[in-house]
Structure formats: C-alpha cells, structure tokens
Swiss-Prot record:
<dbReference type="GO" id="GO:0006364">
    <property type="term" value="P:rRNA processing"/>
</dbReference>
<dbReference type="GO" id="GO:0004222">
    <property type="term" value="F:metalloendopeptidase activity"/>
</dbReference>
<keyword id="KW-0698">rRNA processing</keyword>
<keyword id="KW-0255">Endonuclease</keyword>
<dbReference type="GO" id="GO:0008270">
    <property type="term" value="F:zinc ion binding"/>
</dbReference>
<protein>
    <recommendedName>
        <fullName>Endoribonuclease YbeY</fullName>
        <ecNumber>3.1.-.-</ecNumber>
    </recommendedName>
</protein>
<feature type="binding site">
    <location>
        <position position="111"/>
    </location>
    <ligand>
        <name>Zn(2+)</name>
    </ligand>
</feature>
<dbReference type="GO" id="GO:0005737">
    <property type="term" value="C:cytoplasm"/>
</dbReference>
<comment type="function">
    <text>Single strand-specific metallo-endoribonuclease involved in late-stage 70S ribosome quality control and in maturation of the 3' terminus of the 16S rRNA.</text>
</comment>
<dbReference type="InterPro" id="IPR002036">
    <property type="entry name" value="YbeY"/>
</dbReference>
<keyword id="KW-0963">Cytoplasm</keyword>
<dbReference type="InterPro" id="IPR023091">
    <property type="entry name" value="MetalPrtase_cat_dom_sf_prd"/>
</dbReference>
<keyword id="KW-0540">Nuclease</keyword>
<keyword id="KW-0862">Zinc</keyword>
<keyword id="KW-0479">Metal-binding</keyword>
<dbReference type="Pfam" id="PF02130">
    <property type="entry name" value="YbeY"/>
</dbReference>
<keyword id="KW-0378">Hydrolase</keyword>
C-alpha cells in the first residue's frame, strides 16, 4: 500500500473532512496532470480568525482570505507544501457563488495545489487561467 503523502489537519475549527481517500486520489490526479508528484502536502482547515492572524503574521496583509499556500518544495516537479483554508470563508463564498460548500471547498483544495504547480492569480489573465484550471480540476472528480 502506498504511503500517504497528503494530510488533513484542523486548527480552531470543528470541521470534519469527508471522503478523504477519494480527495487524496483526486489531488494526486491533478498533480500528475500538471506533471508534478506530491511528496508531502498538508491541508490545515481553520477559522477566519486563525487565517487572518496568519495573513497578518506571514504576509503582512490585514484582511480575511480563504486560503494561504506555503510552498516548501525543494525539487522542481515535487510538491511539498502547507495549505491553510478558512472553512468560514469557504462557507461564505459558497453562498456568494451559489455553490455547495463541498464544491467550493474542492475548488479551494485544487486552487492551493495549483499554486504549488506554479499557477498565480494576481493579474486578471492569471486569475482567468487559475479559474479555468480549477474548473478542469473539478471535472476530474470521480466522487
């Protein structure tokens, strides 16, 4: 059996992720499509306040966000990283986007992974590409 390389944690939230095995398989599929492999990827689900403090401490940003991705990779094509996701933001964004919490969470899971494969989202063009990649990633789900 393959050793797990994708881990899920929580900080300052009671959120329980469902379908972990299916999500791991799906995330590995996304990475492979981008010609990457995952050495170690940690997803940490947290509250708005927890992620706001991280945003202040590490990025010097004083606003809420749904995700912060830290790239710890040392070798090109081999993903190592920590992705912090605010469950509060995901729930709010799902309502704003007229989406389900599950779909919005999956979009954000893919978004963080795509950052680790080199995609950015600062410019309008980058945001459009990121959204297209997120949509393509969501279409790969088999669950």
């Amino acid at each position: 059996m393959k050793e797990e390389t994708i881990f899920f944690f929580k900080e300052d939230t009671q959120y329980q992720l469902r379908q972990r095995a299916e999500i791991r398989t799906w995330l590995n599929t996304i990475a492979k499509k981008e010609k990457y492999s995952i050495l170690e990827l940690n997803y940490i689900f947290c509250s708005d306040e927890y992620l706001l403090q991280m945003n202040r401490d590490f990025l010097d940003h004083d606003y809420y966000t749904d995700i912060i991705t830290f790239d710890n990779s040392e070798v090109k094509g081999k993903i190592e990283g920590d992705i912090f996701i605010s469950i509060d933001r995901v729930k709010d964004n799902a309502q704003l986007q007229h989406s389900t919490v599950k779909d919005e969470l999956h979009r954000v899971l893919a978004h963080g992974l795509l950052h680790l494969t080199g995609y950015k989202d600062k410019t309008t063009k980058e945001k459009e590409m990121m959204r297209a990649k997120e949509d393509a990633s969501l279409s790969l789900r088999k669950f």
